[in-house]
């Protein structure tokens, strides 16, 4: 892939830390508590209200990208070390600051399933407050990615547990692999090169488009190429409610592209806003574009949300996580 906008590499070490394989011990653990996207931060009150707490909020509660209204990346709450009782130990995501002048080593420890399952526990060890602030800032991306991956893994595990297997078969027939679609998702449209699958509720709509086109261009993964193909497919296949209306990509805020390698698959991730031409509907989208097997086609999985009455962070995180569940079909034995 050319013209790298940015590159994100989730290391094998981090993925191993965040894996959710249930072993004998995990089977005995209680289920996690808390709402999706929540993090409990175990730190004393003075540090929470000072520079260290500000750093935590900047890193974990900054604005979630490409949402029309401001929403925090995660919802964070403070618990003091003395108040960190059993009730809080079973929370889904926990960030613990262990500040001890007599400690043996500074750094960050990533663990899962310490007190519950599936749980993400991150511990920052430091000799003093300044050291804790430095370590937090130095490991900002990795800490945020660890929590994001833990949230993503829970969604994917649920999708696999309650999977609509027939949808995966349909997608695999067209592109050679498929995400895992949980119960509630239905097939809306299918052509030779375009599939529309959605979970439609009364006031929300979470959809995924899967489409492909020949990899004939020198710059298949530039923003211009990705958006041009996206708009062409949407105009042809996704009409609006009224005549002369269709879904397209909003240019009010320019989409961004970054290249990601995740569990062996390299893809261009595009974030932006969709809208309906000649109408007033819109919302966020995120897409993954990558070469098909043999590199003859470009495959695009495009996840989007319509939820005008509600915050959209969790709706988008849910449908985006399904893109990360994509797997190539295993060869027939």
Where are these regions (language model features)?
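Start-of-domain marker
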Residues: 23-118
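Acidic/His-rich structured neighborhood in mature extracellular/periplasmic domains
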Residues: 134, 146-215
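Surface-exposed amphipathic alpha-helical segments
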Residues: 133-157, 179, 185, 297-333
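Signature of long, low-cysteine stretches enriched in small and polar/charged residues
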Residues: 74-126, 130, 237-295, 310
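Secretory pathway targeting signatures of secreted, lumenal, and periplasmic proteins
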Residues: 25-26, 33, 42-46, 182-241, ...
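Bacterial N-terminal signal peptides that target proteins for export
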Residues: 1-8
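Short, well-ordered beta-strand elements
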Residues: 120-128, 207-212, 297-308
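C-terminal motif of bacterial Sec signal peptides marking the signal peptidase cleavage site
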Residues: 16-19
